[in-house]
């Protein structure tokens, strides 16, 4: 069964690096860990009505963190760097140079 596109893309990444990539028409999203590049591409195209040229994915391991009661773990995440065709953009952060 093909999941709903809004279930694949969880949220955009808000960081200095992701803001810097906006100038290169590359957008960064947190995605489901079991999503593949084809599913991510189709989901972004359907949700934002843009043309995707490339998708790169990064699996980030969760960090081990000290808590009051011992050790805990942050959740592992999967990020997708989505490159759009020239002329297309997504207004999620106000756009490049905003």
Swiss-Prot record:
The keyword Transcription does not apply. Keywords: Ribonucleoprotein, Ribosomal protein, RNA-binding, rRNA-binding. The keyword Iron does not apply. One of its GO terms (molecular function) is structural constituent of ribosome. InterPro entries: Nucleotide-bd_a/b_plait_sf, Ribosomal_uL23-like, Ribosomal_uL23/eL15/eS24_sf. It comes from the Bacteria. GO terms for biological process: translation. GO terms for cellular component: ribonucleoprotein complex; ribosome. Pfam families: Ribosomal_L23. Part of the 50S ribosomal subunit. Contacts protein L29, and trigger factor when it is bound to the ribosome. Belongs to the universal ribosomal protein uL23 family. One of the early assembly proteins it binds 23S rRNA. One of the proteins that surrounds the polypeptide exit tunnel on the outside of the ribosome. Forms the main docking site for trigger factor binding to the ribosome. This is Large ribosomal subunit protein uL23.
């Amino acid at each position: 069964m093909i999941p709903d596109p809004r279930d694949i893309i969880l949220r955009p990444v808000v960081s200095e690096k992701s803001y810097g990539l906006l100038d290169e028409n590359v957008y960064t999203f947190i995605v489901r860990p079991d999503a593949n590049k084809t599913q991510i591409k189709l989901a972004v195209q359907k949700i934002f009505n843009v043309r995707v040229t490339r998708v790169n994915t990064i699996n980030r391991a969760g960090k081990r963190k000290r808590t009051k009661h011992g050790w805990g773990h942050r959740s592992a995440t999967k990020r997708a760097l989505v490159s759009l065709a020239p002329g297309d953009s997504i207004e999620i952060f106000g756009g490049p140079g905003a």
